[in-house]
Amino acid sequence: ATAALIGFEVQSVPAGEDGLVHPAAVREKLGPHVAAIMLTNPNTCGLFEREIFEIAEAVHQAGAYFYCDGANFNAIVGVARPGDLGVDAMHINLHKTFSTPHGGGGPGSGPVVLSERLAAFAPVPFLREKEGALELVEDTEGSQAFGRMTAFHGQMGMYVRALAYMLSHGGDGLRQASQDAVLNANY
């Protein structure tokens, strides 16, 4: 919906009979005027896109970006890292993945994570990892950012709750929660 709202022409890539998106179907849609593709992984059927590396490679070879809908991120937390799968950008639904209330009494919170390829375009302020620590970036000097965000970043309480959830579970607990989510989805 957002892509259409800002003037992009949106086309669907059909899934195969197995419920998965195949690289050949993606390649048919790619061309010089394609800015990005969006894929939910695991998809709405609960299936992990087995050919995600080939899809990412095809998208990048066409000069486009690979955006991942993080709606089902809870199934891969601690198991796979989206950047390692070739994803350039992904939004994270805190209420689906990190146990925050939907909206929490105010605007929701859906952080967006970017690959190094897109980091230079992030509006300020944003956080980035530098030398093993988080750094707050508030200056657009040396970047290609389109400016400073003037809207809210989301409901701050949701970020605190999500962080508390992550810290209380730790890496092993988050991985176990993901494995349990997959088991439940396939039951």
Residue spans of the language-model regions?
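Conserved PLP-enzyme active-site core in the AAT-like
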Residues: A1-L134
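Active-site C-terminal subdomain of aminotransferase-like
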Residues: G83, I92-Y187
